[in-house]
């Protein structure tokens, strides 16, 4: 048996799971919050519903990793560090260089560092997390699992922007797409649930959380996705605007006196359903306000759902049909209201969903279509950490790869 750590390092957080491979048994799941503060919070769940948490000063990610590994031994989850065979790290961006996960060496670290301009908020903490584990577990293989890798199969007609071609060749300006690890997991799982080879399926994956993206997956390969050069492109999100007329940036600079960076900050952090509703970036709050008659909340829900509705139609056309629509992530898995708004009116393309199955369906695998529906509709809770663990085993040749 092989124990793998799946890690997602944020600017002030460290999420992790410890999995036994190849059985894929979850041994522990944890979160360190407020890294860099005197009152950092460490929480871990393990065993049969057991939980441990502590508030303690943690000034660096290295200290957070040290505490994590110490607690794994203290709580008898592992007996020694030697039991950890590999560490898989979620990394935001792999550009065109990485179409698959990769064992991390000095060259890979330099390359990831060079991607910082494309992910200034995410890449530095990704690197910090890697360095912290390398320092404490120097002989354990570390694997980078890129959010963008799954979308490297997109054809040119879907990843190129209609800009001078040299912007692509000289500066790498193109659609990259994100949430690839999630889209990969749910589409593979959909094939298992449908009992059909992934190679034969045309799937539309809707990853709907505070960040949100749709992917068209044909034959197990991403052929199009809504996020672009950055995660700002695409559908309306919690605080991100999604796609809009780029001429708005100089217009708003002129009208508001803001810099380009300030306007982009508004589009990333003050827009989306938060900016539209003036209430919250959390769709649960907006659903409640809409139910109470708040007009801006209702319009926000309509815009959010309508954009997704439109992309489903576009991607069905691109793939010459669709076999299943998948809902995943916080909103996709848990909001029957949003799912209903998105699915309503898709009967013309063979989507017949059952309101009695949709209503109240939360956080569990479930088909919510009528049996006769040509297009299946499936809720699949995402499991990015499992993909990270599988890739770590496969790429580092730790045990026979997961089938």
From Swiss-Prot:
Chain sites annotated for binding Mg(2+): 8, 384
Keyword Transmembrane: no
Highest taxon of source: Bacteria
UniProt xrefs under PROSITE patterns: ACETATE_KINASE_1, ACETATE_KINASE_2
Reaction(s) catalysed by this chain's protein: acetate + ATP = acetyl phosphate + ADP
Site label Transition state stabilizer, positions: 179, 240
Main subcellular location of this protein, as a coarse class: cytoplasm
Record-annotated active site: 147 (proton donor/acceptor)
Matches recorded under Gene3D superfamilies: 3.30.420.40
GO molecular function per UniProt: acetate kinase activity; ATP binding; magnesium ion binding
Cellular localization per UniProt: Cytoplasm
Record key words, sorted: ATP-binding, Cytoplasm, Kinase, Magnesium, Metal-binding, Nucleotide-binding, Transferase
Enzyme class of the recorded protein, top EC level: transferase
Annotated ATP binding sites: 15, 207-211, 282-284, 330-334
Gene Ontology biological process: acetate metabolic process; acetyl-CoA biosynthetic process
InterPro entries, A to Z: Ac/propionate_kinase, Aliphatic_acid_kin_short-chain, Aliphatic_acid_kinase_CS, ATPase_NBD
Pathway: Metabolic intermediate biosynthesis; acetyl-CoA biosynthesis; acetyl-CoA from acetate: step 1/2
NCBIfam families: ackA (TIGR00016)
General function of this protein: Catalyzes the formation of acetyl phosphate from acetate and ATP. Can also catalyze the reverse reaction.
The name this protein goes by in its record: Acetate kinase
Encoding gene, per UniProt annotation: ackA
